[in-house]
Structures are given as structure tokens and as C-alpha cells.
């Protein structure tokens, strides 16, 4: 499913944060035309797809875009993950969208390479964590050399420690499926005390 409202509202799909976190606005326009085009691309590959003309933007979109385009002057839409959270299905989803790679469209796999809420250090201290390091090193190797191994990400070292649930990792699979080529490592640092990495496909 993708958003398709021409002026999406805000969805604050997080809990327990300061009041200011629920006053954020990002008034970027939607992009119904692209949503319809994506529907055609996915339908052509037999991937069930629908557009949601009511849903607004959640933090997976407005947080990164606020940093990149603070004036909210670009049209945007969101695509949801597939039910079942199957890694191969998300690689296939990306592959079905690969025709968009040659156009002036920015695709952000908005997630996190480490997402174990209980393991974060909310003070931000960088503490040694061998399991975290093992998984990040595996992810670097796979994304910069042989992205097809993402299909078996659960077999990676400390996979379920770093991702008790995979919804913050699977956006990476969609991007890798679109590009089908090695990525460039563009971020390798600490967030909330845990090492995290990010990649660019161009």
C-alpha cells in the first residue's frame, strides 16, 4: 500500500516521547501520480498493491525528509512493508520498482541497521557490544559485495539480537532489490550507544 493523498496529514506513530515530538509538522505534498505508476509496476509483477487516499505521513518519512528537505518542497509518498515480513518478498518488491532507478526519484529505505529497543543506551554512551559489531560488519560486507545474501539475513551473526523484529531492516532489502548492485557505505557511527550503518545506491 502507498499513500496517495495530495496533502497528507501527520501520523505520530510513537509513544513516550516529549510533547514537542507530537507537534512536528512536515507539509510536503503527496504524489498521487507516482502512487498510480507504482501500482502499475507492481501489478505487472503480480505483487498485490493498493493506494490509500487517506493515510498521512508517519515518522518513517517525515524524520529523514525534515533533515534533508526542511522546506518540505518536494512531493513524497510512503510504501508500506508487505504482510509476513518476508525478506525475499521485499527484495522482489524492490526489483519490481527498479524501473524508477533511471528517473529523478529519491528512494529512502527508512529504517535502522540496529533496532533492539531494550539494548539502546538512552544516555548515548558508546559501549562495546560484540554482537552489534558482528551484525554491522556482516551487513557492510553483504551490501557492498553481494546483496543477494540479504535474503538469509536471519542466519547472520546476532541477527535477532539486533533485530528482534525485522520491520526496521526490511526497507534496506527493498533498496537492494531495486539497485541489484553493490552499495557504498556512507554512515558507520553510533546512535543511542549502538553502532549503525547506512548505504547509498546510485
Regions found by a protein language model. Give the residues of each.
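Short, solvent-exposed polar/charged micro-motifs at secondary-structure junctions
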Residues: 1, 60-64, 195-197
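Surface-exposed, charge/polar-rich loops and edge strands
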Residues: 40, 44, 74-75, 85, ...
Amino acid at each position: 500500500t502507498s499513500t496517495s493523498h495530495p496533502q497528507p496529514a501527520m501520523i505520530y506513530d510513537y509513544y513516550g516521547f516529549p510533547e514537542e515530538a507530537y507537534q512536528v509538522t512536515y507539509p510536503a505534498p503527496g504524489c498521487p501520480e507516482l502512487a498510480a505508476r507504482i501500482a502499475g509496476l507492481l501489478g505487472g509483477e503480480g505483487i498485490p498493491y493498493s493506494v490509500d487516499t487517506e493515510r498521512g505521513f508517519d515518522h518513517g518519512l517525515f524524520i529523514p525528509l525534515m533533515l534533508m528537505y526542511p522546506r518540505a518542497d518536494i512531493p513524497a509518498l510512503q510504501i508500506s512493508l508487505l504482510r509476513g515480513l518476508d525478506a525475499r518478498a521485499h527484495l522482489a518488491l524492490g526489483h519490481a520498482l527498479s524501473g524508477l532507478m533511471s528517473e529523478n526519484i529519491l528512494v529512502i529505505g527508512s529504517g535502522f541497521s540496529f533496532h533492539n529497543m531494550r539494548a539502546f543506551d538512552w544516555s548515548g554512551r558508546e559501549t562495546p557490544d560484540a554482537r552489534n559489531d558482528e551484525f554491522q560488519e556482516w551487513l557492510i560486507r553483504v551490501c557492498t559485495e553481494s546483496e543477494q545474501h540479504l535474503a538469509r539475513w536471519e542466519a547472520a551473526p546476532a541477527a535477532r539480537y539486533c533485530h528482534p523484529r525485522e520491520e526496521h531492516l526490511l526497507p534496506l532489502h527493498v533498496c537492494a532489490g531495486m539497485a541489484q548492485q553493490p552499495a557504498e557505505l556512507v554512515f558507520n557511527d553510533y546512535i543511542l550507544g549502538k553502532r549503525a550503518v547506512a548505504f547509498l545506491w546510485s
